[in-house]
């Protein structure tokens, strides 16, 4: 953090206890059974609902918790709720924001503001900080636990799009302000601006330099989920084919291990479904020692997921794909469908005809809006039925004609 930024923030009454660089190392937010996690913010939050990565990660990372999610993000919104005013005066947006959050019944709030506010530069920072504190004060009375997200860094695109360097300097200032507010109030802060980076110069995390694409939301979800109880749950299994027997197992249970000729079969029950990764999710490692020289194929519930020679199996092979990953994708698609229904539940199209000044023209359309509720409940029940892992049948077999 530069001295100028620090001086500006201190002048605004933002207090740092451990230094801004250490703020996102604060204690993680622990989820509880039955938590309702509500995402609140601007375009960064609203667009998350069409990808579903974060809530899928939190769901599969906590299979024993009955988590549910609501997205009340609103494009171009700010900490004052101005965009939510719609046809009313901008000042009325804050009251609507509070009602939308209250209607969602959160126990946990993940809040993402600041990206559009940063266009006001340093001059707009006092109003932003004051507005953010006012928002948190209004929400804190419910006893909800909160996590604050920074804005994301703008990507440099090809001309004629402008160089984002100056705006990224502004975003640095606003990120530091949010970090300071989180420190002051002992809230979890996740620094997406600093940590959300592409793996290579060719990779793009946005569609236009500003708004995250699928890869961007996947990686952002990983960063957030790692701080909210869904990180670091890789599984590993080591087997000695000579006995046969289990040498070690992490994050899973093994049963019915048998060896018949050149084939080893066993059942695996994971503690949680695999996590997403940028490489497609291959975070389970299987080591098998004592195999006769040759090539072996691994099938899970009859689906081929890996092939390697005996020396590679001895060293350890990363296993990805298969039924568990299909299960995760089903959960993600169900989350997206549920989000679609909830969006139209709390924010229906043709608002003036349903609740506004033209509602008398077409009768009582508002009575139909609660009909979204059973559709939402149906999707959540389907997610609940999939989030807990089931035992899988593994088969490691030597390929005919493999190396002798």
Label every PLM stretch briefly:
Residues 72, 146-153, 168-203, 218-237, ...:
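Extracellular serine-dependent O-acyl
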Residues 1-7:
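Bacterial N-terminal signal peptides that target proteins for export
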Residues 32, 49, 204, 208-404:
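Conserved catalytic region of serine esterases and O-acyltransferases that act on ester linkages
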């Amino acid at each position: 953090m530069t001295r100028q930024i620090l001086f500006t923030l201190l002048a605004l009454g933002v207090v740092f206890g451990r230094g801004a660089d250490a703020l996102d190392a604060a204690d993680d937010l622990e989820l509880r059974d039955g938590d309702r996690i509500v995402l609140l913010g601007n375009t960064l939050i609203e667009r998350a609902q069409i990808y579903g990565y974060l809530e899928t990660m939190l769901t599969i990372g906590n299979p024993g918790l009955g988590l549910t999610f609501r997205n009340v993000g609103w494009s171009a919104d700010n900490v004052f709720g101005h965009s939510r005013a719609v046809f009313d005066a901008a000042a009325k947006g804050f009251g609507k924001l509070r009602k939308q959050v209250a209607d969602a019944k959160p126990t946990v709030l993940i809040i993402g503001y600041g990206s559009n506010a940063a266009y006001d530069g340093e001059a707009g920072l006092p109003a932003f900080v004051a507005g953010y504190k006012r928002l948190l004060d209004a929400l804190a009375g419910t006893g909800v636990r909160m996590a604050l997200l920074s804005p994301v860094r703008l990507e440099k695109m090809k001309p004629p799009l402008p160089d984002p360097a100056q705006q990224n300097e502004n975003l640095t200032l606003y990120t530091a302000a949010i970090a300071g507010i989180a420190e002051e109030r002992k809230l979890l802060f996740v620094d997406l601006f600093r940590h959300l980076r592409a793996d290579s110069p060719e990779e793009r995390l946005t569609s236009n330099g500003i708004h995250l694409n699928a890869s961007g939301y996947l990686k952002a979800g990983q960063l957030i989920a790692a701080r909210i109880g869904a990180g670091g749950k890789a599984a590993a299994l080591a087997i000695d084919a000579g006995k046969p027997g289990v040498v070690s197992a992490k994050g899973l249970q093994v049963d019915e291990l048998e060896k018949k000729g050149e084939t080893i079969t066993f059942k695996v029950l994971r503690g949680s479904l695999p996590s997403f990764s940028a490489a497609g999710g291959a975070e389970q490692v299987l080591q098998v020692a004592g195999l006769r020289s040759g090539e072996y194929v691994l099938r899970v519930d009859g689906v081929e997921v890996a092939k390697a020679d005996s020396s590679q199996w001895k060293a350890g092979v990363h296993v990805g794909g298969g039924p568990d990953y299909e299960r995760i994708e089903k959960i993600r698609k169900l989350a997206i469908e549920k989000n679609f229904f909830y969006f139209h539940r709390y924010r229906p199209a043709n608002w003036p005809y349903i609740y506004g000044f033209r509602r008398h023209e077409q009768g009582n359309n508002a009575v139909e809006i609660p009909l979204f509720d059973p559709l939402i409940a149906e999707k959540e029940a389907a997610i609940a039925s999939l989030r807990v892992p089931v035992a899988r049948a593994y088969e490691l077999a030597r390929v005919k004609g493999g190396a002798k």
